[in-house]
């Protein structure tokens, strides 16, 4: 086991604080509408330019192991805020630095660290309740666009795109961000249910100009099995041909004689048919077939529940207004399923989302909800260079997370104003002893830090602006983009409540742990020079030549 280097008390805390400051100082220059960029060197390819706090934090690794421990603990604050709310990483880092700095001063002055931590925790718990009281719902497109704009560093086009996407696919819809091909940002919306399976034979194509299969008002046969024998399908095919409508077959697979017969029938114009594989694998495929059945008002033909394909009737088939099938995707538009059944299915999947343990499962379930309840929107980010594309894509993703958080828990006045108002409301909060009172003051003073940093990044004097904002009330604050005072909500400067709350809670959590640290242990660096010196002694063997 390697030897350890151990530091105690003030020595440990000073080193830790130094690491915290290096990381926080690098991250906090990005805060606010006039925040600066940070350039990150990459081992290959062009450097990355970013204003995303968590991207900067993730790159920082310090040589001194004690300092690095401090930096890594604050990095955890940024990562946690990012995982929970998707934004607010820089705010969380600024708050953590402020609480740690003030808290360690109090510890150095002889205060009891445990009581300080209790005071900080008490202030933060009260502050979270006050934030919830200040929060207003965010439901209209204008507010959503404003939140997106602020989070994307005052880029109005991004805010409007996200609001438009949410309008089109609903609050439950899936919105993804991809690289665009041009200079302009674009929004693509897929209506209806789309899954990533294309036609099984190009002979089904009836729109050669687009290379697609389009079926108007088709019947939809859903089978949880491989179909290779055409005799199984004859009763259904005859019934569909009599009804004079097209047929879409979604099955585990359609192969051999069955596929060949379907192709021949289609080419001769006897019945218009297309076949695709069912999406997903294993249990997920069964679940997705059931989703499609609910959406189209059909029944999944499955031998597990005693249903046979030969006995299927038109009543077992689903229906939709239109189906479009490409080489890689199938889109079902306007299924005729009952709204109550669809909502019941959505509620069932939501329950599974709450119980899911892995992020992958949760994401796949969320996609299924979106396909049933809303739709899928794709924001294609346009940029002139790859470096700009990466930076802009990160901003759009941040803005998307922020708007989702805003819809979930509402919004408060932005620009650090909400925390200032919360701190002033808690001015009379008291703990059980004087040291807890100091902890409360540490937390309340730290709540001014985000506003001060935003102002500092503008090149203004933080104390002057902070005192002016504190003298006002309600949503009165400082708009750093235009450098004027006014009602933040009227000016469209909004922060999602969830983002502000998460930033404060995670900052206080890690800061409390660091304030109560009394000892730090790390590996001693290996002395490579000594090892090499020992090996070098073997060179003397060359003298053995004299023995002849």
Curated annotation (Swiss-Prot):
Cited SUPFAM superfamilies: GroEL apical domain-like (SSF52029), GroEL equatorial domain-like (SSF48592), GroEL-intermediate domain like (SSF54849)
UniProt-listed Enzyme Commission number(s): 5.6.1.7
InterPro entries: Chaperonin_Cpn60_CS, Cpn60/GroEL, Cpn60/GroEL/TCP-1, GroEL-like_apical_dom_sf, GROEL-like_equatorial_sf, TCP-1-like_intermed_sf
Cellular component terms (Gene Ontology): cytoplasm
Major site of localization recorded for this protein: cytoplasm
Lineage: superkingdom: Bacteria
Biological processes per GO annotation: protein refolding
Record has Amino-acid biosynthesis as a keyword: no
An example Gene Ontology molecular-function term: unfolded protein binding
Catalytic activity: ATP + H2O + a folded polypeptide = ADP + phosphate + an unfolded polypeptide
Compartments (UniProt record): Cytoplasm
CDD domains attached to this UniProt entry: GroEL
Keyword terms, alphabetized: ATP-binding, Chaperone, Cytoplasm, Isomerase, Nucleotide-binding
Residues bound to ATP: 30-33, 51, 87-91, 415, 479-481, 495
Function (record text): Together with its co-chaperonin GroES, plays an essential role in assisting protein folding. The GroEL-GroES system forms a nano-cage that allows encapsulation of the non-native substrate proteins and provides a physical environment optimized to promote and accelerate protein folding.
Stated family: Belongs to the chaperonin (HSP60) family.
HAMAP family per UniProt: CH60
Subunit structure: Forms a cylinder of 14 subunits composed of two heptameric rings stacked back-to-back. Interacts with the co-chaperonin GroES.
Protein name: Chaperonin GroEL
Organism from which the protein derives: Escherichia fergusonii (strain ATCC 35469 / DSM 13698 / CCUG 18766 / IAM 14443 / JCM 21226 / LMG 7866 / NBRC 102419 / NCTC 12128 / CDC 0568-73)
Gene assigned in the entry: groEL
């Amino acid at each position: 086991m390697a030897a350890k280097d151990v530091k105690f008390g003030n020595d440990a805390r000073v080193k830790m604080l130094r690491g915290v400051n290096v990381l926080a100082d690098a991250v906090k220059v990005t805060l606010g509408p006039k925040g600066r960029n940070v350039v990150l060197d990459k081992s290959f390819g062009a450097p990355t330019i970013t204003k995303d706090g968590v991207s900067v934090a993730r790159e920082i690794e310090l040589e001194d192991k004690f300092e690095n421990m401090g930096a890594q603990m604050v990095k955890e604050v940024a990562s946690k805020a990012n995982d929970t709310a998707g934004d607010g990483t820089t705010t969380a880092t600024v708050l953590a630095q402020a609480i740690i700095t003030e808290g360690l001063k109090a510890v150095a002055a002889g205060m009891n660290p445990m009581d300080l931590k209790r005071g900080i925790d008490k202030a933060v718990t009260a502050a979270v309740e006050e934030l919830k009281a200040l929060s207003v719902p965010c439901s209209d497109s204008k507010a959503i666009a404003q939140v997106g704009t602020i989070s994307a560093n005052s880029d109005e086009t991004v805010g409007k795109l996200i609001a438009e996407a949410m309008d089109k696919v609903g609050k439950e819809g899936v919105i993804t961000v991809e690289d665009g091909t041009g200079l302009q940002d674009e929004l693509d919306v897929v209506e209806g249910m789309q899954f990533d399976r294309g036609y099984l034979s190009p002979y089904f194509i009836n729109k050669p100009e687009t290379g697609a299969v389009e079926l108007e008002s088709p019947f939809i046969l859903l089978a949880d099995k491989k179909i290779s024998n055409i005799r199984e399908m004859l009763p259904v095919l005859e019934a569909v041909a009599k009804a004079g409508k097209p047929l879409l077959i979604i099955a585990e697979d359609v192969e051999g004689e069955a596929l060949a017969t379907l192709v021949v029938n289609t080419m001769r114009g006897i019945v218009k048919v297309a076949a695709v594989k069912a999406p997903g694998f294993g249990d997920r495929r069964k679940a997705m077939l059931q989703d499609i059945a609910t959406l189209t008002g059909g029944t999944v033909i499955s031998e597990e529940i005693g249903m046979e394909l030969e006995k299927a009737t038109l009543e077992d088939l689903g229906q939709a207004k239109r189906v479009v099938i490409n080489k890689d995707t199938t889109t079902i538009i306007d299924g005729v399923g009952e709204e109550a059944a669809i909502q019941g299915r959505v509620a069932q999947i939501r329950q599974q989302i709450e119980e899911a343990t892995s992020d992958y499962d949760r994401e796949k379930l969320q996609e299924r909800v979106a396909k049933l309840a809303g739709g899928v929107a794709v924001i294609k980010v346009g940029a002139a260079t790859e470096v700009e594309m990466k930076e802009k894509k990160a901003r759009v993703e941040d803005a998307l997370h922020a708007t989702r958080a805003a819809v979930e828990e509402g919004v408060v006045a932005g620009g650090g104003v909400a925390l200032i108002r919360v701190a002033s409301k808690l001015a009379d909060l008291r703990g059980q002893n004087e040291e807890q009172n100091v902890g409360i003051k540490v937390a309340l003073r730290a709540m001014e830090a985000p506003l001060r940093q935003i102002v500092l990044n503008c090149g203004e004097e933080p104390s002057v602006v902070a005192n002016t904002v504190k003298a006002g009330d309600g949503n009165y604050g400082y708009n750093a983009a235009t450098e004027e005072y006014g009602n933040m909500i009227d000016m469209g400067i909004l922060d999602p409540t969830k983002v502000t709350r998460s930033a404060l809670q995670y900052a206080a959590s890690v800061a409390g742990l660091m304030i109560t640290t009394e000892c730090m242990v790390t590996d001693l660096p290996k002395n490579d020079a000594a090892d090499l010196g020992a090996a070098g002694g073997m060179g003397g063997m060359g003298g053995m030549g004299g023995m002849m």
